[in-house]
């Protein structure tokens, strides 16, 4: 197992899957554990932006719920975010049920106003990498709709909620 994959698995187990009072007692990612148990996570590590493009192109050819593209070579956050935003817009216009979500060490939970989601000390300080999660947009939005009803987003700043939930919903509805 690649060290980055091991680190992501640890982050998921020790943080994403752990209940949080500020999320109405739910874990940051209530669906992560099931994806691991069902072997629904595929990794693409250090394949460059070409590898990310390939994973997007080939997403419909497999049955994984999520592809985690990770890179220890860090593209500029604005550049990576712009690529993924552009892909998300194009996928929405084309009616393709897919969404890319960026995680970058230059923009953490506190930058998004989500201090309660800080995970200091959980991941390796020896590794630095960015990630893009590739998933089905409909499944993400259906999950968000369910989580909204549970009070999950109650402590999210409005601009973060808009970016994470409402902007994604607009893409799903074809109103990018």
Question: Which residues are covered by each model-predicted region?
Answer:
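Expand to "…catalyze enediolate/carbanion chemistry for C-C bond making/breaking, isomerization
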Residues: 1-176
């Amino acid at each position: 197992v690649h060290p980055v994959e091991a680190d992501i698995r640890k982050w998921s187990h020790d943080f994403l899957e752990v209940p949080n009072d500020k999320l109405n007692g739910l874990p940051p990612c209530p669906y992560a554990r099931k994806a691991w148990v069902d072997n629904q996570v595929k990794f693409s590590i250090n394949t460059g932006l070409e590898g990310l493009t390939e994973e997007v192109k080939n997403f419909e050819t497999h049955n994984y719920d999520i592809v985690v593209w990770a890179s220890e070579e860090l593209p500029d956050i604005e550049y990576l975010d712009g690529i993924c935003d552009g892909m998300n817009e194009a996928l929405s216009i084309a009616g393709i049920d897919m969404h890319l979500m960026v995680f970058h060490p230059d923009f953490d939970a506190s930058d998004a106003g989500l201090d309660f989601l800080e995970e200091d000390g959980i991941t390796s300080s020896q590794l630095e990498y960015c990630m893009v999660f590739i998933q089905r947009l409909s499944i993400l939005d259906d999950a968000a709709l369910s989580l909204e009803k549970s009070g999950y987003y109650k402590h999210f700043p409005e601009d973060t909620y808009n970016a994470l939930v409402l902007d994604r919903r607009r893409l799903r509805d074809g109103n990018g």
